[in-house]
Structure formats: C-alpha cells, structure tokens
Regions:
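Conserved catalytic scaffold of divalent metal-dependent phosphoesterases
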Residues: 1-35
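Short hydrophobic beta-strand that contains or immediately precedes a catalytic carboxylate
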Residues: 3, 38, 57
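Catalytic metal-binding/acid-base residues of hydrolase active sites
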Residues: 7-9, 40-44, 61-62
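N-terminal start-of-chain detector that recognizes signal peptides
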Residues: 8-9, 26-29, 45-49, 54-56
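Hydrophobic, aromatic-enriched interface-forming segments
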Residues: 33-42, 47
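Acidic, His/Gly-rich catalytic cores of divalent-metal-dependent hydrolytic chemistry
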Residues: 35, 48-120
C-alpha cells in the first residue's frame, strides 16, 4: 500500500475522481503497490482501476469538497479501503468559525456550508 498527499510527483497536483482509469493508472501505478491512497482534493472515493490497482482518496473530516457535509474518512480492512461518513453539527462549527479571528474565516465558512470549493 502506498500513501501520498497528492501524488508521488507533487504535493499539490492530484487527479480528480472524474479522471480516467488511464490517468489514475499513470499517476499511481508507479508507486509499485496494489493500493494507492491520497488526500489533497477533499473528495472521498474508492475506485478499482484494474486487478492490480485500487485508488482511493481519504476525503475530509472538516472541509469536504464533494457536496456531502458529513465528515469523511477512509477505513482500511487489511488492504481493502472503504469510505465512512459521520454526521456532525455543521451549524455549531460555522458559529465557532465566525468568532475565532481566523484569517479568511468567511471564505472557509462558505466552503464548509456548501461542501464545495469556493473562490476567495
């Protein structure tokens, strides 16, 4: 199993879930493992590319970008990844965010409220 933030080539560039099997294969097969797990894009999914490769994204516990406001995490059963979702009080989180003094809190709140990336 290989774990990377985005890809073996970059901490910032990673394929989206809509990428073709060929693109995912080209990015993650070079890791030399049957399961490749990455993060960075905040969109949880598991996809079996071939008999030799499964690619998974961990999603995001607190700032999902897939429209599902529940916290997402990846669970491994041996080498089999699956996505789990947990409800939490998003309104309470938004309220806490509004008074915390964090730079760009309004921008982060828009993303948290929609579960989608937003322009600042």
């Amino acid at each position: 199993m290989a774990l990377v933030h985005a890809s073996s080539e970059s901490s910032w560039r990673a394929p989206e879930p809509e990428a073709s099997d060929a693109e995912l294969d080209a990015v993650y097969r070079r890791l030399g493992q049957s399961v490749a797990i990455y993060a960075h894009i905040h969109r949880a999914y598991v996809r079996r590319i071939s008999e030799e490769l499964t690619v998974a994204n961990t999603g995001s516990v607190g700032l999902p970008y897939d429209g599902d406001l529940r916290a997402a995490y990846l669970l491994l059963d041996g080498s089999t990844p699956s996505i789990r979702r947990v409800e939490y009080d998003v309104d309470a989180e938004l309220k806490a965010l509004s008074g915390c003094g964090l730079p760009h809190a309004d921008w982060i709140a828009r993303m948290l409220a929609t579960g989608k990336p937003q322009m600042p």
